[in-house]
């Protein structure tokens, strides 16, 4: 089943016509402020595969209609195999710490620790996050957000917002809006950690909201 889902996702990058096959249907488009690229990390099948082998761009889009065509054509969040990821980043930015646009930044993250807690709502949370990011309503005009990530893991399912820097005054606004977008309660916390700190074992988050 995992291989089937991974194959379905990979096939989207082979031919954009698998998503859009009607010029008439998508003739009237509502452009987004930025162009976005969807990436997919497939689960590792052998130890010789590294991160770069597993991370693949799927498709780039620039309108509301294109977004919905893609979203409705790929496996939903709760059907992704373990150790896979979705990444939605502004065009030209790879979802890697080493990318110049990400190297001085970090990520806001919300984690689910129990699988039973995730499945009924993860699709809804992921969609809310996607819409906030492509609509650029989760940030002010500083162009602070680079992308959004969904990680599927055995012990934790995570939704994360990647930022271009670690300016705390800007970060708090993004974190507060993320909580609002995901409709989290006061007991459900989002945490920010810089990418540099994430490389340090046992590092604590810099901000918790």
From Swiss-Prot:
Gene Ontology biological process terms, A to Z: nuclear-transcribed mRNA catabolic process, nonsense-mediated decay; positive regulation of formation of translation preinitiation complex; regulation of cell cycle; translational initiation
Residues in the signal sequence: none
InterPro entries the record matches: TIF_eIF4e-like, TIF_eIF_4E, TIF_eIF_4E_CS
Gene3D superfamilies the record matches: RNA Cap, Translation Initiation Factor Eif4e
Binding site for mRNA: 51-52, 97-98, 153-158
GO molecular function: mRNA cap binding; phosphatidylinositol-3-phosphate binding; RNA 7-methylguanosine cap binding; translation initiation factor activity
Family matches, as Pfam families: IF4E
Keyword Protein biosynthesis: yes
Keyword hit for Protein biosynthesis: yes
Keywords of the record: Initiation factor, Protein biosynthesis, RNA-binding, Translation regulation
GO cellular component: cytoplasmic stress granule; eukaryotic translation initiation factor 4F complex; nucleus
Quaternary organization: eIF4F is a multi-subunit complex, the composition of which varies with external and internal environmental conditions. It is composed of at least eIF4A, eIF4E and eIF4G. eIF4E is also known to interact with other partners.
Protein role: Recognizes and binds the 7-methylguanosine-containing mRNA cap during an early step in the initiation of protein synthesis and facilitates ribosome binding by inducing the unwinding of the mRNAs secondary structures.
Stated family: Belongs to the eukaryotic initiation factor 4E family.
Name by which UniProt lists this protein: Eukaryotic translation initiation factor 4E
Organism: Candida albicans (strain SC5314 / ATCC MYA-2876)
